[in-house]
């Protein structure tokens, strides 16, 4: 059975006819065409599919699309503006926190959720925020440094205002 799904996706209101059993991951990738959210384990284990739902990290591979009805959903595509990387994305690039890139969107979205909640996280808080995201390439040191760099850049920007 299909029903209408209404949500705000990356700042825009959407309304789509979606099967009741469709996963949020499939909705984003197949229906909407947003492929930044990666399909990794399909079991809620790797974090590659992390998106933000009302500013909180959520695994799109284990969330039905209809569970986000009426909510604000953000994917990694929402972070760059007019082709310019966000401070967080730029920090991941600068600090080589991307390597193969497969886990990067999920890492970035988990980090974005952390920085929105806590603009100046400790290393332990960063480690805890990234704990649900598996990375076989970087060993997490570069990812953690990326988050620290982005946090400092954001705080510096806020102080300049």
Curated annotation (Swiss-Prot):
For binding [2Fe-2S] cluster 2, which residues are annotated in this chain's numbering?
Answer: 100, 103, 135, 137
Q: Which UniProt keywords apply?
A: 2Fe-2S, Iron, Iron-sulfur, Metal-binding, Oxidoreductase
Catalytic reactions of this protein: oxidized 2[4Fe-4S]-[ferredoxin] + benzoyl-CoA + H2O = 4-hydroxybenzoyl-CoA + reduced 2[4Fe-4S]-[ferredoxin] + 2 H(+)
Disulfide connectivity for this sequence is none
Database matches in CDD domains = fer2
Q: Which PANTHER family does this UniProt record tie to the protein?
A: OXIDOREDUCTASE WITH IRON-SULFUR SUBUNIT, XANTHINE DEHYDROGENASE IRON-SULFUR-BINDING SUBUNIT XDHC-RELATED
Protein name per UniProt = 4-hydroxybenzoyl-CoA reductase subunit gamma
Q: Which organism encodes this protein?
A: Thauera aromatica
């Amino acid at each position: 059975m299909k029903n209408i799904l209404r949500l705000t996706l990356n700042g825009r209101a959407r309304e789509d006819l979606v099967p009741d059993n469709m996963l949020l991951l499939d909705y984003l990738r197949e229906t909407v065409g947003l492929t930044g959210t990666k399909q990794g384990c399909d079991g809620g284990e790797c974090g590659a599919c992390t998106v933000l739902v009302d500013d909180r990290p959520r695994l799109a591979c284990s969330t039905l699309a209809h569970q986000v009805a009426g909510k604000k959903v953000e994917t990694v595509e929402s972070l760059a503006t007019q082709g310019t990387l966000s401070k967080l994305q730029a920090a991941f690039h600068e600090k080589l926190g991307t390597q193969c890139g497969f886990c990067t969107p999920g890492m970035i979205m988990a980090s974005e959720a952390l920085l929105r909640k806590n603009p100046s996280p400790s290393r332990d808080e960063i480690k805890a925020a990234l704990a649900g995201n598996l990375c076989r390439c970087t060993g997490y040191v570069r990812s953690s440094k990326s988050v620290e760099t982005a946090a400092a850049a954001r705080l510096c920007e806020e102080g300049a205002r």
